[in-house]
Amino acid sequence: MAKLIKHGSEGREQVLKGVDILADAVKVTLGPKGRNVLIEQSFGSPKITKDGVTVAKSIELKDKIRNAGAQLLKSAATKAAEVAGDGTTTATVLARALAREGNKLVAAGYNPMDLKRGMDLAVNAVVEEIKKSSKKINSQEEIAQVGTISSNGDKEIGEKIAKAMEEVGKEGVITVEEAKNFSFDVEVVKGMMFDRGYLSPYFVTNSEKMVAELENPFILLFEKKLSNLQPMLPILEAVVQSQRPLLIIAEDVEGEALATLVVNRLRGGLKVAAVKAPGFGDRRKAMMEDIAILTKGELITEDLGMKLENVSIKSLGTAKRVTISKENTVIVDGNGDKKNIEDRVLQIKSQIAETTSDYDKEKLQERLAKLSGGVAVLKVGGATEVEVKERKDRVEDALAATRAAVEEGVVAGGGVTLLHASQTLRNLKVDNKDQQAGIEIVIEALKDPLKQIVENAGENGGVVVGKLLEHKDKNYGFNAQDMQYVDMIKAGIIDPAKVVRTALQDAASVASLIITTETLIVDEPSDKEDSIPPMRGGMGGMGGMDF
């Protein structure tokens, strides 16, 4: 295909136009008085959201070069969401400010590589300042405050997240699902999470969140590697007849077996996902036995003379729901017998008491926590499907931000920490004026998140920034909800340090890429329609399956 090539400032200007289009759509959601964005869906009713990354992900531009800029900015928002669970709009606002100011200086003749070095120095200094000023959170009240702010001021969400953490511990497994009624409840169910993700992204059922969600699945636990599905045909046929999904947990699923599962998943004949078993060696076997007890299934092991071809559907475990991400698998509400689970817990406790190895003790305690801790489920209800989905998005954001706060502590919110941190950059020593200009870019950009929060509340951002910079107290800020100047920490307006840090680092990374880019190569726009016909789903034969 022919390529379109642009050099220098001409290309960068077009990239920045794409950055501006995406940033203008996302920035309106920032702060307690941020607005909603309505997004057309390919099917069903439109989505209404105040979540920056959801807005960013929905944007594709027709112009290829502008779209390249939008996609770069989208990557900053997406990365912030993946690492810290929040801060996506802050990352977008910062990245746009850094890229815009940097491009102006490059056009004025400054060296882009030295500008980048100056920006990197400044960002590292601000990150250290954020770490220094962060405060650990311990109380339920502080956890609720973080959840409230991250869910756009919804106190109920903050309180429910704090309650869920109290039930299963700060490191415990908490999931979010839609309720069948108007209420918003916390329920603790039998469940387990382990650190193994899907073996192929083709198993994903929710492409927006990149997770595989299996409702009421069968669970096959196999001790060895699966490289050929031939021995499994009888059990696979039985699962297809039941019209329920299947989760395969094995030492590994590889080659022909994995390819066949993927093909059948894509053709819709078999709702399936496969993950590697957690742990190694003897510990792997023990953990698989734990999962078997939790789900009322059997571990298919050759030690007991069991063979895959002889396995019936009765040997499979079951659970209410399984969610699989790139890195983790969460089994919610396994159908295991309560007494069997309690007996297994007692057995592990006695092993902990008997072992002399610190390492073994630690691993046994991990197993005990997984088996006995349970899973807290936040059940989100509402009057309409649109309302439930919008609220569920906010709950998921708030939960991720609260976890980040527990991990790295909190700082003053509302853009105040970044604003005051910018003033510590005046004393940085650099090699030349171009690097100094890079530092100045960061100093100016760090004002933008606070300005945007204030402007979304209907006030003048520049005036508020000026007033705050006159004040020596680093926690002194502007409460955009009540339109008052307050001590942000005392007022409970706090942000997770990890969210603020990640937003800045991801924004600087993307902005640096833009200002150091000299040539752009994209596909030449084509007037022809796509000549490839759409794929047809399903195949004849055994339930659309192809073994």
Swiss-Prot record:
One Pfam family, short name: Cpn60_TCP1
Catalysis performed (reactions): ATP + H2O + a folded polypeptide = ADP + phosphate + an unfolded polypeptide
SUPFAM superfamilies: GroEL apical domain-like (SSF52029), GroEL equatorial domain-like (SSF48592), GroEL-intermediate domain like (SSF54849)
RNA-binding as UniProt keyword: no
Residues holding ATP: 29-32, 50, 86-90, 414, 495
Region named Disordered: 525-547
Keywords: ATP-binding, Chaperone, Cytoplasm, Isomerase, Nucleotide-binding
Enzyme Commission (EC) number: 5.6.1.7
Compartments, record wording: Cytoplasm
UniProt keyword Cytoplasm, yes or no: yes
Skewed-composition ranges (Gly residues): 537-547
GO CC, alphabetical: cytoplasm
GO molecular function, one term: unfolded protein binding
Coiled-coil residue spans: none
Main location as per UniProt: cytoplasm
Family under the similarity heading: Belongs to the chaperonin (HSP60) family.
Its biological purpose: Together with its co-chaperonin GroES, plays an essential role in assisting protein folding. The GroEL-GroES system forms a nano-cage that allows encapsulation of the non-native substrate proteins and provides a physical environment optimized to promote and accelerate protein folding.
HAMAP family: CH60
Name of the featured protein: Chaperonin GroEL
Gene source species: Rickettsia felis (strain ATCC VR-1525 / URRWXCal2) (Rickettsia azadi)
Highest classification ranks of the organism: Bacteria, Pseudomonadati, Pseudomonadota, Alphaproteobacteria, Rickettsiales
